[in-house]
UniProtKB/Swiss-Prot annotation:
Possibly involved in the regulation of flight muscles contraction, possibly by modulating actin-myosin interaction. One of its GO terms (molecular function) is structural molecule activity conferring elasticity. Keywords: Muscle protein, Phosphoprotein. Found only in indirect flight muscles (IFM). One of its GO terms (biological process) is sarcomere organization. It comes from the Eukaryota. Residues 1-15 have a biased composition (Acidic residues). GO terms for cellular component: A band; striated muscle myosin thick filament. Residues 1-76 are annotated as: Disordered. The gene is fln. This is Flightin. Several forms of flightin are thought to be produced through post-translational modifications, possibly by phosphorylation.
């Protein structure tokens, strides 16, 4: 891709000019700036010689530039996606099952038939009333019967008795507080 022009490239010259300008004779950057050099005892005096005299021969050696990165041709291996997806049919809660049946069943049926190759009409959106009627249109075997239990009656009486004092005092407080308005 070196001979092709990069449509997304915003630089004028490219990497070749940058590499040529760095190798053409620009000095290598120093390892430490003079203002950053530390004055520790170990750095400043080693066997009676100052640190600046010792560091001078090390800076004479040129630091080699890192090799240029390999040329990127822009090709990325495509991600392999599996075309066949088995839709999970297990639903944990009965409420979620009823909601799915009520709301999404037409669309799911359309997708299932389309995957098997059967032509089917595209489902139209339902009104709220249609969805409610579909939910309540349950066969006799699926009806959950409710038989009032003795425990339910006891809980209702206990709750009513425990909240009675709260209701009384709240009503008394409101009447007293807002007597001038009422």
């Amino acid at each position: 891709m070196a001979d092709e022009e990069d449509p997304w490239g915003f630089d004028d010259g490219g990497e070749e000019e940058k590499a040529a300008s760095t190798q053409a004779g620009t000095p290598a950057p120093p390892s430490k700036a003079p203002s950053v050099a530390s004055d520790h005892k170990a750095d400043s005096v080693v066997a009676g010689t100052p640190a600046n005299e010792e560091a001078a021969p090390e800076e004479v050696e040129e630091i080699k530039a890192p090799p240029p990165p390999p040329e990127d041709d822009g090709y990325r291996k495509p991600v392999q996606l599996y075309r066949h997806w088995v839709r999970p049919k297990f639903l944990q809660y009965k409420y979620m099952y009823n909601y799915r049946t009520n709301y999404y069943d037409d669309v799911i049926d359309y997708i299932d038939k389309k995957q098997t190759g059967v032509a089917r009409e595209i489902p139209r959106p339902q009104t709220w009333a249609e969805r409610v009627l579909r939910t309540r249109n349950i066969s006799g075997s699926d009806i959950d019967s409710y038989a009032p239990a003795k425990r339910d009656k006891q809980l209702i009486q206990t709750l009513a008795a425990s909240i009675r004092t709260y209701n009384y005092h709240t009503k008394a407080y409101i009447n007293q507080r807002y007597a001038s308005v009422l």
